[in-house]
């Protein structure tokens, strides 16, 4: 990606109080997954995988906040969209109108789509495998100035993750006891009990 654009993206993300990363297809190149995990962990950047087509980040990663962006978008002040054609549904999800939005990907604006109307303050064209490394390096050069902000955000995210885990366990326990009908979380829980490390899950919908 263009170095000047990468620097601008780094500045946006490092100055943000409530940044968010949204992706769907980045994991098509498996080499990008550890790069995103490294970036998110280092700078306490929460990640939403919205309607994912691939594994983009480990489900138990401390910065993986789930699959729905709606609860986060009203408060975000910066969004990094990585290899994602539809990062949210405008009629359902309300983005903070003052948020800066950066799109990153080989075709960040999906120019072949007849209609696509998402805000964009900066478009970075390039492979996510290359651009994520560039972005981490650019953000690292600003790291000392944002340490307190990043540390505070990390603590807040850890608390939210703990609450998410407790709610998920409560829901699964309720279903297991027969007090509630099974849902997607229950199916995922059951699959997780039987799958092996090298198993491949295919979702057809």
Give the ranges of each region predicted by the language model:
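Conserved phosphate-coordination/catalytic loops
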Residues: 3-4, 63, 67, 126, ...
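Glycine-rich, acidic loop regions that bind phosphate or pyrophosphate groups
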Residues: 49-160
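A general structural motif
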Residues: 1-10, 182-183, 205
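Well-ordered alpha-helical segments embedded in enzymatic catalytic cores
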Residues: 4-8, 131, 186-190
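Active-site diphosphate/adenylate-binding microenvironment
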Residues: 158-205
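Generic amphipathic alpha-helical segments used as scaffolds and interaction surfaces in large
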Residues: 23, 27-30, 122, 126, ...
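Anionic-ligand anchoring segments at beta-strand to alpha-helix junctions in alpha/beta enzyme folds, i.e.
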Residues: 8-79, 193-205
């Amino acid at each position: 990606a263009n170095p000047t654009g990468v620097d601008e993206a780094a500045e946006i993300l490092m100055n943000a109080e409530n940044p968010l990363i949204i992706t769907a297809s980045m994991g098509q190149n498996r080499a990008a997954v550890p790069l995103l995990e490294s970036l998110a962990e280092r700078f306490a950047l929460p990640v939403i995988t919205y309607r994912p087509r691939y594994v983009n980040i480990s489900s138990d990663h401390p910065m993986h906040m789930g699959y729905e962006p709606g609860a986060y978008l009203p408060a975000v002040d910066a969004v990094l969209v990585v290899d994602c054609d539809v990062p949210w549904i405008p009629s359902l999800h309300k983005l903070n109108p003052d948020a800066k939005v950066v799109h990153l990907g080989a075709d960040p604006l999906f120019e072949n789509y007849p209609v696509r109307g998402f805000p964009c303050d900066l478009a970075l064209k390039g492979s996510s495998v290359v651009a994520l490394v560039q972005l981490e390096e650019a953000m690292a050069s600003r790291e000392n100035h944002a340490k307190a902000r990043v540390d505070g955000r990390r603590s807040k995210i850890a608390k939210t993750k703990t609450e998410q885990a407790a709610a998920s366990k409560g829901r699964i326990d309720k279903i297991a006891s027969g007090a509630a009908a099974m849902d997607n979380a229950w199916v995922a829980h059951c699959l997780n009990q039987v799958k092996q490390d090298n198993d491949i899950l295919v979702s057809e919908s």
